[in-house]
């Protein structure tokens, strides 16, 4: 009896770690370039895991498909597939549809909720939050390496627009950086300070006024929502 319970708990823990690792890796690597092969591997593993879970306990996950979000994404996917009938290059169109809708939007709508179905709400929030923070950290690290390589070739920062491509991902990940400030712990405040300095340098290096304005507006809205006046004074 005891041994059966032990192995049952071990199996549940293994499954929980597997689920969390898949979601963490998917979010963390999403904004990185040059690792497409590994991204596809993660997507394949998530898809297989989702199919296995749905086949084993279909009723357990049925409520996830009774939402307006899933219905909207399903309609979008069907409409995109029907558009192939009018496309002059069905192969190229299918490739873009698979990448933009099926692999990203549909996967996020189905796979992530299914994989994290048995997790507590607090645990899901932590997984998603630290995944975005890790994604921001890796994005900043990879971009600093790019700046270092440019410097070795005699290209100084803010010299041209070659780093503008990171604007969208930096703006998208900015709220995660702001929420790091809400964790009242010395090590997290230090992490916030270090990441903030790097973030400011990189976002200025994009030379994108649209990105600057977006970060400013997001920051002001966040400060007003959470009433973090000290952060406003520091800024």
Name each model feature, range by range.
Residues 45-50, 104-113, 168-180:
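Hydrophobic cores of alpha-helical transmembrane segments in multi-pass inner/ER membrane proteins
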Residues 68-76, 90-115, 126-129, 136, ...:
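Aromatic-anchored transmembrane helix interface
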């Amino acid at each position: 009896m005891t041994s059966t319970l032990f192995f049952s708990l071990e199996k549940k823990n293994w499954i929980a770690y597997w689920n969390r690792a898949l979601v963490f890796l998917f979010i963390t690597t999403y904004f990185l370039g040059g690792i497409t092969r590994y991204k596809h591997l993660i997507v394949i593993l998530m898809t297989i895991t989702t199919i296995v879970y749905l086949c084993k306990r279909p009723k357990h996950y049925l409520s996830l498909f009774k939402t307006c979000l899933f219905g909207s994404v399903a309609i979008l996917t069907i409409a995109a597939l029907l558009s192939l009938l009018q496309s002059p290059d069905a192969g190229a169109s299918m490739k873009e549809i698979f990448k933009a809708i099926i692999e990203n939007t549909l996967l996020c709508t189905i796979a992530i909720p299914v994989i994290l179905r048995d997790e507590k709400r607090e645990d899901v929030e932590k997984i998603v939050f630290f995944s975005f923070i890790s994604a921001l950290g890796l994005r900043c690290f990879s971009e600093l390496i790019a700046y270092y390589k440019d410097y070795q070739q005699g290209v100084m920062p803010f010299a041209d627009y070659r780093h503008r491509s990171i604007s969208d991902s930096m703006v998208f990940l900015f709220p995660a950086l702001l929420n790091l400030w809400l964790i009242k712990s010395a090590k997290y405040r230090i992490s916030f300070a270090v990441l903030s300095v790097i973030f400011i340098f990189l976002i200025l290096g994009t030379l994108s006024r649209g990105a600057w304005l977006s970060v400013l507006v997001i920051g002001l809205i966040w400060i007003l929502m959470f009433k973090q006046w000290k952060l406003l004074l520091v800024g």
